[in-house]
């Protein structure tokens, strides 16, 4: 079992055969060693009990019911006075049945088997270490050809040092047929190596430090050579250099983790605990079994057949032995990763078997669904909507979610303030939704941050902390500026909310994970809290105005026609002259009174520097008054001058949307300046 206090992390890697044996082997009180699964059976069809030494054997994996052996005898678990601790008839220990969730078994393979993950997955670690083509290694593993053993001290029967399958292809057919099983074994064990055993021998003979040194020397030699002028040759050199770098990194990893390369070839195959590959009885007496059980059965069947061929039969041709070794290799490949070599294996209903890789990988795999994606207490989930009135570090929680998340804190507050005598009374007050409950809830939420997470959490900003406030409705309100860190938008995205309970988690949430403390991207350092999506659309609508310029009303024939039929009034500015305002407050007031629209053009009095106005710009139109004053109308501003050409005032042509946007920016700049002045 994994103790959460002793084990802080989980690492998946290669293990030695001795470690696999230590995991699965156990010594029962009578001194007998059990752990090897030798029979491909599961349950007896008459007694409906696990078969001995089978895939669900109670001697190997523990009892199905706590304290009850296969014979039906019962002992109290943990009672030292009860002797013996196991059944002398069936050999089953009187222990808790939960042992079947972690007690493993093993299958002793008659021939070595290459782990398909390290052979067929890209990049192929075995091919990288041996510096050989993957196709050649596959032919060797699946017994398509053989090679001569590199024995230097003794003369070989064939007097060969390298591979001979390229020169005489017919040998791989003639030699196995010529020798009988007994003679072929002597010849093969001395002269020929094939199958995964050949790969294991080559991996065992490797010196990782020499591999690193030789690869480094070759890499330097290739780097010293200049371009050849041939594009194809230059690409080959670049690919070779990249391969050498990967090979050196792989060898360093093996040395650093104390892993032997020959462990990539299996001699013992671990058997998963029965509870992780169950057989369930459904209505009608039918049984539903995990696909892994059928794949394990196939491995045991073929392995036992190979054992019989090598031990009992004396006249079996060697070719048949090699074919059976290939079948064992393919059965283990299907168990580990079905379909990695091409067409996947299917059952009688043409359904693809679910291998070990399929069980653990993907969104519905063991890790993401059961270990990483499991539901936890003090958490909730809802759709996110925009909260434009929120501060950057705040989020809005619905009352329904907040009262569930902080229910224990509210109960403690009710009892401390003597508003409830016990937990039951406090829960009844919460169910009745009394006003005092919401007051205490707000007090609790003020001092307790929450964590918001949006899947998939691909980087650090995928989960951030916020100060929660109560909102109406059933959706979580979020400030739009934090959407980029979550890669979220408001088209139906959902987010999970978690409550940090320990003091360490709360301190981390306040000091490191608050949204207003994560304004820069941890990857490249660029600002992460920038307007995106909805905010950009809103700013565009706010500042778009009318696309037609100042001459639209005068030179548009449709507007002229409408102008002639329109009744002129002081409150109608649609096709009459554009209104003038002395300040922004009057313009916004007119908008609130619905006298003008958000994008209606207007003239606003403004303190504009004369140097900003281009002196060479020609006015579009000039309006003269009876007293000699005149208005020079330009594309974006208007100047009121006297008879002596003195400037009385300047108006700019804008909209209410531009005014609102400008005021927000001005207030933000003033607030930032005040904060800087206070800091200094």
Curated annotation (Swiss-Prot):
The keyword Chloroplast applies. Gene3D superfamilies: 1.10.40.90, 2.40.40.20, RNA polymerase II, clamp domain (4.10.860.120), RNA polymerase Rpb1, domain 3 (1.10.274.100). Mg(2+) binds at residues 489, 491, 493. InterPro entries: DNA-dir_RpoC_beta_prime, RNA_pol_asu, RNA_pol_N, RNA_pol_Rpb1_1, RNA_pol_Rpb1_3_sf, RNA_pol_Rpb1_clamp_domain, RNApol_RpoC1. Its main location: plastid. Its EC number is 2.7.7.6. GO terms for molecular function: DNA binding; DNA-directed RNA polymerase activity; magnesium ion binding; zinc ion binding. One of its GO terms (cellular component) is DNA-directed RNA polymerase complex. Binds 1 Mg(2+) ion per subunit. Binds 1 Zn(2+) ion per subunit. It catalyses: RNA(n) + a ribonucleoside 5'-triphosphate = RNA(n+1) + diphosphate. It comes from the Eukaryota. Keywords: Chloroplast, DNA-directed RNA polymerase, Magnesium, Metal-binding, Nucleotidyltransferase, Plastid, Transcription, Transferase, Zinc. SMART domains: RPOLA_N (SM00663). The keyword Nucleotidyltransferase applies. Zn(2+) binds at residues 69, 71, 87, 90. In plastids the minimal PEP RNA polymerase catalytic core is composed of four subunits: alpha, beta, beta', and beta''. When a (nuclear-encoded) sigma factor is associated with the core the holoenzyme is formed, which can initiate transcription. Belongs to the RNA polymerase beta' chain family. RpoC1 subfamily. DNA-dependent RNA polymerase catalyzes the transcription of DNA into RNA using the four ribonucleoside triphosphates as substrates. This is DNA-directed RNA polymerase subunit beta'. The gene is rpoC1.
């Amino acid at each position: 079992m994994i103790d959460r206090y002793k084990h802080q992390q989980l690492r998946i890697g290669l293990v030695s055969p001795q470690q696999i044996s230590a995991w699965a082997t156990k010594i029962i009180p009578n001194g007998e060693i059990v752990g090897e699964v030798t029979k491909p059976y599961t349950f007896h069809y008459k007694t409906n009990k696990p078969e001995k030494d089978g895939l669900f054997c109670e001697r190997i994996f523990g009892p199905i019911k706590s304290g009850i052996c296969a014979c039906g005898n019962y002992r109290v678990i943990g009672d030292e006075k009860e002797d013996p601790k196991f059944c002398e008839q069936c050999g089953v220990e009187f222990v808790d049945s939960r042992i079947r969730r972690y007690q493993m078994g093993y299958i002793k393979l008659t021939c070595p088997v290459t782990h398909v993950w390290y052979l067929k997955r890209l990049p192929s670690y075995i091919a990288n270490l041996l510096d050989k083509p993957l196709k050649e290694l596959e032919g060797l593993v699946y017994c398509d050809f053989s090679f001569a053993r590199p024995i230097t001290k003794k003369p070989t029967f064939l007097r060969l040092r390298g591979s001979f399958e390229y020169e005489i292809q017919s040998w791989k057919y003639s030699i196995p047929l010529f020798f009988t099983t007994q003679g072929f074994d002597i010849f093969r064990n001395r002269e020929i190596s094939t199958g995964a055993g050949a790969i294991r021998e080559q991996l065992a003979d490797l010196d990782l430090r020499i591999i690193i040194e030789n690869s480094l020397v070759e890499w330097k030699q290739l780097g010293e050579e200049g371009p050849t002028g041939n594009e194809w040759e230059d690409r080959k050199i670049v690919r070779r250099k990249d391969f050498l770098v990967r090979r050196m990194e792989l060898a360093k990893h093996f040395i650093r983790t104390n892993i032997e390369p020959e462990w990539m070839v299996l001699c013992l195959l671990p058997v998963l605990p029965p509870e992780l590959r169950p057989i369930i009885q459904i209505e009608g007496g039918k049984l539903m079994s995990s696909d892994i059980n059928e794949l394990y059965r196939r491995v045991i069947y073929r392995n036992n057949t190979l054992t019989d061929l090598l031990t009992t039969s004396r006249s079996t041709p060697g070719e048949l032995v090699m074919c059976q070794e290939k079948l064992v290799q393919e059965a283990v490949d299907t168990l580990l990763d079905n379909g990695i070599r091409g067409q996947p294996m299917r059952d009688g209903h043409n359904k693809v078997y679910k291998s070990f890789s399929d069980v653990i990988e993907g969104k519905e795999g063991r890790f993401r669904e059961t270990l990483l994606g499991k539901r936890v207490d003090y958490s909730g989930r809802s759709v996110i909507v925009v909260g434009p009135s929120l501060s950057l570090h705040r989020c809005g929680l619905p009352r329904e979610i907040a009262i569930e998340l902080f229910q224990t804190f509210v109960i403690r507050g009710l009892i401390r303030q003597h508003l409830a005598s016990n937990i039951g009374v406090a829960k009844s007050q919460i169910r009745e939704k009394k006003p005092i409950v919401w007051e205490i809830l707000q007090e609790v939420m003020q001092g307790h941050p929450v964590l918001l997470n949006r899947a998939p959490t691909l980087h650090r900003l995928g989960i951030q902390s916020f100060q929660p406030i109560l909102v109406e409705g059933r959706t979580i309100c979020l400030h739009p500026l934090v959407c980029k860190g979550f890669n979220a938008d408001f088209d139906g995205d959902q987010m999970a909310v978690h409550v940090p309970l320990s003091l360490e988690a709360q301190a981390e949430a306040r000091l490191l994970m608050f949204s207003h403390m994560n304004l820069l991207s941890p990857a490249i350092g660029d600002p992460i809290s920038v307007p995106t999506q909805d905010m950009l659309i809103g700013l565009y609508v706010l500042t778009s105005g009318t696309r037609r310029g100042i001459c639209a009303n005068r030179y548009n024939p449709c507007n002229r026609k409408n102008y002639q039929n329109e009744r002129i009034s002081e409150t109608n500015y649609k096709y009459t002259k554009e209104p003038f305002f002395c300040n922004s407050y009057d313009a916004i007031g007119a908008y609130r009174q619905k006298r003008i629209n958000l994008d209606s053009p207007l003239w606003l009095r403004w303190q504009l520097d004369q140097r900003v106005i281009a002196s060479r710009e020609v006015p579009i139109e000039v309006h003269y008054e009876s007293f000699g004053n005149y208005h020079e109308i330009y594309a974006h501003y208007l100047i009121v001058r006297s008879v002596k050409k003195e400037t009385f005032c300047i108006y700019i042509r804008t909209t209410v949307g531009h005014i609102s946007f400008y005021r927000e920016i001005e207030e933000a700049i003033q607030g930032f300046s005040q904060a800087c002045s206070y800091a200094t």
